[in-house]
C-alpha cells in the first residue's frame, strides 16, 4: 500500500495534479489502509503483551469497521 502511494506521488510529480482531490484520496486511502493493517497485526500478534485479552475476532472486526469508515470518508471527499 505504501509503494502504491509512492507511485502515485511520483506520477503526480511527473504528470501534474489537476484533479488534486482524487490524488489526495488515493494517497490517503493507501496510507490509511497500511496504518490499519499494521494496527491489526499488532493486535493479533500473540507475543504482544498489551493486547492479550483482545480476541482476534474483535481485532479483525475493528479493522473492517475502521476500513469501512476510512473509505466512506474518502468517497465523500471525492464528491
UniProtKB/Swiss-Prot annotation:
Associated pathway: Protein modification; protein glycosylation
Entry protein name: Dolichyl-diphosphooligosaccharide--protein glycosyltransferase subunit DAD1
The record's similarity note reads: Belongs to the DAD/OST2 family.
One of the protein's GO biological processes: protein glycosylation
Quaternary structure and interacting proteins, as annotated: Component of the oligosaccharyltransferase (OST) complex.
Q: What does this protein do?
A: Subunit of the oligosaccharyl transferase (OST) complex that catalyzes the initial transfer of a defined glycan (Glc(3)Man(9)GlcNAc(2) in eukaryotes) from the lipid carrier dolichol-pyrophosphate to an asparagine residue within an Asn-X-Ser/Thr consensus motif in nascent polypeptide chains, the first step in protein N-glycosylation. N-glycosylation occurs cotranslationally and the complex associates with the Sec61 complex at the channel-forming translocon complex that mediates protein translocation across the endoplasmic reticulum (ER). All subunits are required for a maximal enzyme activity.
Cytoplasmic topological domain residue ranges:
41-58
Give an example GO cellular component term for this record: oligosaccharyltransferase complex
Task: Provide the protein's localization.
Answer: Endoplasmic reticulum membrane
Q: Which PANTHER family match?
A: DOLICHYL-DIPHOSPHOOLIGOSACCHARIDE--PROTEIN GLYCOSYLTRANSFERASE SUBUNIT DAD1
Pfam family name, one: DAD
| The keyword Magnesium appears for this protein | no
For membrane topology, the record states: Multi-pass membrane protein
The entry's keywords: Apoptosis, Endoplasmic reticulum, Membrane, Transmembrane, Transmembrane helix
Q: What's the main place this protein lives? A: endoplasmic reticulum
Task: Name the source organism.
Answer: Zea mays
Residues crossing the lipid bilayer are 20-40, 59-79
Amino acid at each position: 500500500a505504501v509503494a502504491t502511494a509512492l507511485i502515485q506521488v511520483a506520477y503526480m510529480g511527473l504528470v501534474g495534479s489537476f484533479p488534486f482531490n482524487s490524488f489526495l484520496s488515493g494517497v490517503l486511502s493507501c496510507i490509511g489502509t497500511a496504518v490499519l493493517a499494521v494496527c491489526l497485526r499488532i493486535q493479533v500478534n500473540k507475543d504482544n503483551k498489551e493486547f492479550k485479552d483482545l480476541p482476534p475476532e474483535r481485532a479483525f472486526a475493528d479493522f473492517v469497521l475502521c476500513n469501512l469508515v476510512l473509505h466512506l470518508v474518502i468517497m465523500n471527499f471525492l464528491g
